């Protein structure tokens, strides 16, 4: 007859702390392993290098062709003519916020083609 996992858990739960320590030591010796926790140093470094997933497209300067920039902003944002004009004239300002990297790069190319200066943050 074999012992089930539940029976093992119940047996360990009924042991004192000293008995559990002795059990762990015996298991380490029997199986040639260590119950020590693995250091989490490299994982913390990986979190610090977390890649940004949302970007803001900032219009920093209008450039010489204001009308083309307004048209590009209207096409990208679905704003009306007055709202797009106000947005462009308020530069430096955010054209779109929390967009993907691909969308931000595409919008930057469109606005720069229209003559605007653009940053992605």
Swiss-Prot record:
What SUPFAM superfamilies does the database record attribute to this sequence? ClpS-like, Ribosomal protein L7/12, oligomerisation (N-terminal) domain
Keywords (alphabetical) are:
Ribonucleoprotein, Ribosomal protein
What GO cellular component entries does it have? cytosolic large ribosomal subunit
Coiled-coil intervals, chain numbering:
none
**GO MF term list:** mRNA binding; structural constituent of ribosome
The protein's matches in CDD domains, at most eight in alphabetical order, are given as:
Ribosomal_L7_L12
One Pfam family in the UniProt entry: Ribosomal_L12_N
Q: This protein's superkingdom?
A: Bacteria
One of its GO biological process terms is: translation
Q: What does this protein do?
A: Forms part of the ribosomal stalk which helps the ribosome interact with GTP-bound translation factors. Is thus essential for accurate translation.
* UniProt similarity note: Belongs to the bacterial ribosomal protein bL12 family.
Q: Which HAMAP family match?
A: Ribosomal_bL12
Q: How does it assemble?
A: Homodimer. Part of the ribosomal stalk of the 50S ribosomal subunit. Forms a multimeric L10(L12)X complex, where L10 forms an elongated spine to which 2 to 4 L12 dimers bind in a sequential fashion. Binds GTP-bound translation factors.
Protein name per Swiss-Prot or TrEMBL: Large ribosomal subunit protein bL12
Q: What is the lineage of its organism?
A: Bacteria, Pseudomonadati, Pseudomonadota, Gammaproteobacteria, Aeromonadales
